[in-house]
Amino acid sequence: MTAHEVNFDGLVGLTHHYAGLSFGNEASTRHRFQVSNPRLAVKQGLLKMKALADAGFPQAVIPPHERPFIPALRQLGFTGSDEQILDKVARQAPRWLSSVSSASPMWVANAATVCPSADALDGKVHLTVANLNNKFHRALEAPVTEALLRAIFRDESQFSVHSALPQVALLGDEGAANHNRLGGEYGSAGVQLFVYGREEENEIRPARYPARQSREASEAVARLNQVNPQQVIFAQQNPEVIDQGVFHNDVIAVSNRQVLFCHEAAFARQKVLINQLRTRVDGFMAIEVPAGEVSVSDAVATYLFNSQLLSRNDGSMLLVLPRECQDHAGVWRYLNKLVAEDNPISAMQVFDLRESMANGGGPACLRLRVVLTEEERRAVNPAVMMNDALFTALNAWADRYYRDRLTAADLADPLLLREGREALDVLTRLLDLGSVYPFQQTGAADG
C-alpha cells in the first residue's frame, strides 16, 4: 500500500530559555543563563516546516505545552494563587521555576515512538508516549503529550495512542530519538531498530553521563506498539559516545528507508548490527562516517547526525542540516564529498536553528516521523497540516504573543504566565484541538 512519511514538528514554546537543565546534553550545559529569543526560535522552526512542505514533504505541527506549569509546583508544596506561587518559587527555589518553564516539549522526537500500520500486528498506526523520566523537566510532559496526540490522531479505527510507561528508572523511555525504521517503500513492512543505553543485568553502560533509554523500556514499547516480533532489532548504543555527549541515538545516527547514516562508533557491536540489517533489509546501505573524517566531538558540536534524511520522488535523498554543519570546515568538507559519491544522499539543505541548537536540539529533535497511508492521512486532524494559510496564521500568532528576549528572571513574571495561557487558548482553536491543557480544564485561565 502507498504511504508517505509525514514530519510532525514541535512548535517552540513561549518560555524557551537557557537553563542548562539537561545533564549529558553538552549544548544545554554550555549555553546556561544566556538570553533567549522565543519569537526567533518559533519562527526558525516554522521556516523549516514551511520550506520542507513547499518542497513536497508532508509537514504538520504539534503545539507547545503550558509553561510555567503551575500544577507541578503545587505538587512540590508551593501554595497560594498562581501569581503567589510564581513569586514564592522564584525567591525560594528558582531552579524549580526554570524546570517547570522548560520549552523542551518542542523536541517532539521524544514525544512518542511510532509504529506504522504496515509493521503492526493489528494493522493500525501506534504511538506510545515517552515517559522521559531521566530528567524532571521532561518527565512532566507525558500527560499533555498524550492529550495532544489524541487530539491530532483522533480516529481510533486507524490510530492507537498508548500512555507512557510507568515512571521508574528501569523503564526509562526517550521516544523516537532512540528508534529507527529501515526498509523499502514506506508502505511496506520495515525493520524497526530500537536503540538502548543500558539494561538491568548488563554492566556495559556509560560512566560519565546517564544512559536514558533502557532495553526493558524499548521491549515494552515494541509490545505496546504491536510491532511484529519478526521485524524488531534491539541494539545497544556505544556507551563511550554517550559519555561524549550523545544522549540520544539521533545525535549519532539517522535512517531513512534502506539507508543508515551513522558514525562508525555509534553502536556497541556495530559490525554485528550492520550484518543483521544487511540480511533483513533488501538493498540495505550503511554509510558509516569514520572518526578520521569527523570525530564524535565534532559530530556532537555540529549535530551532523541530528539531521533529517528525506526521500524525494526520484528515489534520491535530501539531508536536512543545521547551519552549524556548514560553519564547520571539516564537517562541511565531508558532507560535500558524501553527496558527490555514489549513494542515495544527493542533496543537502541547511537551516538556521540556532535558538534550538543552543539547547541541544537540531532538525531531527524537532520532528516526529509518522508514516501514513492516504486513508490514514485523511483521518489526521486536518487543522495541524502545514500549508500557506497555517504558516501565515502561526507567524501572526507568534508576533502577537512571543517575547523577543527572555531570561531566567523573567519566568517569575505573572504576565508571562497569562500571555502563555492566552496564546495556547487561541492556538487550540486555530488547530481544532479542544481543551487539551490543564488550565483550560480547570477554568484557571485567569490565574
Swiss-Prot record:
The active site is at residues 174, 248, 365. InterPro entries: AstB_sf (IPR037031), SuccinylArg_d-Hdrlase_AstB (IPR007079). Pathway: Amino-acid degradation; L-arginine degradation via AST pathway; L-glutamate and succinate from L-arginine: step 2/5. Keywords: Arginine metabolism, Hydrolase. Substrate binds at residues 19-28, 110, 137-138, 212, 250, 359. Catalyzes the hydrolysis of N(2)-succinylarginine into N(2)-succinylornithine, ammonia and CO(2). HAMAP family: AstB (MF_01172). NCBIfam families: arg_catab_astB, PRK13281.1. Homodimer. This is N-succinylarginine dihydrolase. The lineage of its organism: Bacteria, Pseudomonadati, Pseudomonadota, Gammaproteobacteria, Enterobacterales.
